[in-house]
Each structure stands twice: as structure tokens, then as C-alpha cells.
């Protein structure tokens, strides 16, 4: 992405919700590289899909020659952002937050280049400037510049202030000051002139712009990316099992890949613009080809491949594709022990069983059948496979060779109903 028209390019991709003084920002970008930042609060032990758009935006700016600062909120994570939250957040312990800070910093690192000369990325932590700040300094040097009248009129906290059952504590109310000071601090330390974030961060970003102007007399800017929505109105980034995480231990690469494969046709081309680095021309060409092919669209596979590679690397992508192919074909010979571990984690339903069980019992325990009687009929009708091999004997007992890697047996009823037995 060429820097001079970067904002226009982001707008073409649908990646800009709001921007302060767009003309002045475009002018500033045209003058040469800038430093910009995005903050990530450690509110869990992993980032999730909702963090991916702003994180990839940092990467887009770096590719255009700008210097990204990834700020992990070691201090703000101890407080909790009330923006558009219906209730007060639970406060986490310092040890927990510190542990999460380390994990999130490691997660952010692969997306940015920390060794590319002038525009190498920087990892920062706001605990560095808040950790030893005393309350009087905070109130005199920061609080003095904030008008409570303006703060209570910010959309992000308005709804909480108007609810009788859920007010807002002074702790969460002060979050706005902390994030505002982050911007002023990064402006002074690294010359940061732009903050990017989700659209729910607009109120916090504009506070930082005002504070930076008051403290350092510098003009700085804010840009928010939109909240990702799905065409059917359901929430993006959630599955029946909850959030889709970037940590492979919380959402396996296979499950992650499948999430993207299942994208609706109405969303897929928009998501290619949000989550990949394909050019608009390439995406439009793909859409045209899909429309004219008369076959199932290729776009979902392209999207799944691109995003899985971005988040889990080539190895994670190949494992996800291998598992997908083996489940589709029914032949399991290509699967490694690690592949089976992904399936056990969240890929297919899983049941633990003691050795010595028979097939009928396994079908009932795995909920592939409601009763032994029904299981008997289904086995006899040749509708059950064990590790891809048909089994039609209702009296069948599992043998040692059925336990792949000594641990796993994959049952299938019909074409699509799987359950993985993990032997105790």
C-alpha cells in the first residue's frame, strides 16, 4: 500500500469507521512515515477474532512504511474499559494480568516486523508509566485536563450512567483518562501521531487527542475500524462453543480454518477485504469468477487459507487442510498424532472411554445413537465406520489396532456424524 493514499485504500476495503480531521491526516501521511499505535488490553489469556482487524491494520500501515507501536495494557487491563459494556468487569489479580500481558505480547509479535530498520515495530506496556505513578500526580497532571461534563456525555458510558441496576464505578470511569494519557505518553516517547482501534474506542481516542494537544501542543489523529457484522445479523467471531481465539491451544488451527470455510456467500468477499492482504482487484476478479463458474464459490477456501496462514503459519494451515481432507475422504492414514490432538481439542465431538468397550456401547456413549438397540440396527445396516473402515458386526469389540497412536479411535455414522474416542 502506497502511503500517500493509504486512508483512501483503507476506505475502499471498508476498514474506516471514523477518522478525525481526515484531510490533515492524509496530508501528514503524504509528508512521510509516521508512528502510530493500537492498544490491546489483557482481558483474557488470548486475543480473539475481534482483535484481528485493528492488528492487521497496524500491519497495513507498516507495509506502507510507517512505524507501528503495539501497546499491551498492563495497567489498563487492571482497571477494565467500560465502553459499551452493560455491567462492571470483574477485576483480575496483578499476577493474572501480568501472565496475560506476556501471552498477548507474544501473540502480537508475529504480525509485525520488529527488525526492518527505520520503521521497525515497537512493543510497549502502559504499566511502565502508570505502575509507579502516585494518585496526586495522576489527579493534578492528568485529571486536571478532563471535564467530567464531557466525560459523562460520551456515548460509551452514557448507557451505564442511565441504568439504575448497573451504575459505573469511579475505577472504570477513570479508564478514559488512562487511555488518553497513553496517547500523550507515546506521542512524547516515540512521536506517535495516530491511534487506531475498534469503533467502540472512539470516545477514548478523542480524549487522548485532546490531552496530547493540551500537554504537548501537538496535533494527533484517531482512526477507528468498524465493528464486523454478518449479513444475517448474528454476531461475528463467535461459534456455538464461544469466541474464536488466536491461541491454537484455545481454538485449534483446524477449527479456525473451518470457521472461515463456513463463511456465508453474502459475507465472504467483504471479509477478504478485511482480513487478507489480497488487492481489491484480486478480490473482485475472484468474485466474478465465482459468479460465472456455476459451481460452489472458491472464495471461502481462499479466505480460510489466507487467514489461517496469517495466524497459524504454513504448518498450522497444512495441518488444518490435511485434517479437513482426511475427514472428507474417510482415509485417516495421513493424520499425525498432533492432528488427532487437534480433533480431540475441538474438532469433532469427543468421548473418553475405558478399554474393553464394545462398539454398541461406544455409539451410545458418544451420542451417535440413543440406545444399544438402535446402535445394533445402525451397525447391521453398514452405516458405521471405525477409522474409515466399515464395521457391520453389532457384537464387535475394539482391538488394539483400532487405537491409533495407542490413544484414538474415530467413529463415523453416515457421512458426516463423527465422534473421537480417547482411550483412558
From Swiss-Prot:
Pfam family membership, one: tRNA-synt_1b
Motif 'KMSKS' region: where in chain: 235-239
Binding site for ATP: 238
Gene3D superfamilies: HUPs, RNA-binding S4 domain, Tyrosyl-Transfer RNA Synthetase
Alphabetized UniProt keyword annotations: Acetylation, Aminoacyl-tRNA synthetase, ATP-binding, Cytoplasm, Ligase, Nucleotide-binding, Protein biosynthesis, RNA-binding
Main location: cytoplasm
Enzyme Commission number(s): 6.1.1.1
Gene Ontology terms: cellular component: cytosol
Compartmental location: Cytoplasm
MF GO annotations: ATP binding; RNA binding; tyrosine-tRNA ligase activity
SMART domains noted in UniProt: S4
Annotated SUPFAM superfamilies: Alpha-L RNA-binding motif (SSF55174), Nucleotidylyl transferase (SSF52374)
Binding site for L-tyrosine: 37, 175, 179
Ranges for domain S4 RNA-binding: 357-414
Positions of modified residues (N6-acetyllysine): 144
BP GO annotations: tyrosyl-tRNA aminoacylation
Recorded catalytic activity of this chain's protein: tRNA(Tyr) + L-tyrosine + ATP = L-tyrosyl-tRNA(Tyr) + AMP + diphosphate + H(+)
Family as reported in the entry's similarity comment: Belongs to the class-I aminoacyl-tRNA synthetase family. TyrS type 1 subfamily.
The protein's assembly and partners: Homodimer.
HAMAP family named in the record: Tyr_tRNA_synth_type1
Function recorded in the entry: Catalyzes the attachment of tyrosine to tRNA(Tyr) in a two-step reaction: tyrosine is first activated by ATP to form Tyr-AMP and then transferred to the acceptor end of tRNA(Tyr).
The protein's name in its UniProt record: Tyrosine--tRNA ligase
Organism: Escherichia coli O8 (strain IAI1)
Gene: tyrS
Amino acid at each position: 500500500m502506497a502511503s500517500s493514499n493509504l486512508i483512501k485504500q483503507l476506505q475502499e476495503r471498508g476498514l474506516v469507521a471514523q477518522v478525525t480531521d481526515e484531510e490533515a491526516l492524509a496530508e501528514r501521511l503524504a509528508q512521510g512515515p509516521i508512528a502510530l499505535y493500537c492498544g490491546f488490553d489483557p482481558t483474557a489469556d488470548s486475543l480473539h477474532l475481534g482483535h484481528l482487524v485493528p492488528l492487521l491494520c497496524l500491519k497495513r500501515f507498516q507495509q506502507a512504511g510507517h512505524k507501528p507501536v503495539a501497546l499491551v495494557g498492563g495497567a489498563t487491563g487492571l482497571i477494565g474499559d467500560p465502553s459499551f459494556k452493560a455491567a462492571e468487569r470483574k477485576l483480575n489479580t496483578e499476577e493474572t494480568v501480568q501472565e496475560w500481558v506476556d501471552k498477548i505480547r507474544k501473540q502480537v509479535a508475529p504480525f509485525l516486523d520488529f527488525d526492518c530498520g527505520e520503521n521497525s515495530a515497537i512493543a510497549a506496556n502502559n504499566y511502565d508509566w502508570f505502575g509507579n505513578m502516585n494518585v496526586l500526580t495522576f489527579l493534578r497532571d492528568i485529571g486536571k485536563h478532563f471535564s467530567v461534563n464531557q466525560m459523562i456525555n460520551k456515548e460509551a458510558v452514557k448507557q451505564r450512567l442511565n441504568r439504575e441496576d448497573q451504575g459505573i464505578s469511579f475505577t472504570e470511569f477513570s479508564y478514559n483518562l488512562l487511555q488518553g494519557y497513553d496517547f500523550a505518553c507515546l506521542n512524547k516517547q516515540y512521536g506517535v501521531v495516530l491511534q487506531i482501534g475498534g469503533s467502540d474506542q472512539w470516545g477514548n481516542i478523542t480524549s487522548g487527542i485532546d490531552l496530547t494537544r493540551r500537554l504537548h501542543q501537538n496535533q494527533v489523529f484517531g482512526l477507528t475500524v468498524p465493528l464486523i457484522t454478518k449479513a444475517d445479523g448474528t454476531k461475528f467471531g463467535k461459534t456455538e462453543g464461544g469466541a474464536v481465539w488466536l491461541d491454537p491451544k484455545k481454538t485449534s488451527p483446524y477449527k479456525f480454518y473451518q470457521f472461515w470455510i463456513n463463511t456465508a456467500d453474502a459475507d465472504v468477499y467483504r471479509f477478504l477485504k478485511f482480513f487478507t492482504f489480497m488487492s481489491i482487484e484480486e478480490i473482485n476478479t475472484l468474485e466474478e469468477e465465482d459468479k460465472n463458474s456455476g459451481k460452489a464459490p472458491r472464495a471461502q477456501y481462499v479466505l480460510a487459507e489466507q487467514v489461517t496462514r496469517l495466524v497459524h503459519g504454513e504448518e498450522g494451515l497444512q495441518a488444518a487442510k490435511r485434517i479437513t481432507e482426511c475427514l472428507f475422504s474417510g482415509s485417516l492414514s495421513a493424520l499425525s498424532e498432533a492432528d488427532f490432538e487437534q480433533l480431540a481439542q475441538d474438532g469433532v465431538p469427543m468421548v473418553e472411554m475405558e478399554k474393553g468397550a464394545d462398539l454398541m456401547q461406544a455409539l451410545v456413549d458418544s451420542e451417535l445413537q440413543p440406545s444399544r438397540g438402535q446402535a445394533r440396527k445402525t451397525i447391521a445396516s453398514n452405516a458405521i465406520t471405525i477409522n474409515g473402515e466399515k464395521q457391520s458386526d453389532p457384537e464387535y469389540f475394539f482391538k488394539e489396532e483400532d487405537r491409533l497412536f495407542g490413544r484414538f479411535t474415530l467413529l463415523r455414522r453416515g457421512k458426516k456424524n463423527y465422534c473421537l474416542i480417547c482411550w483412558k
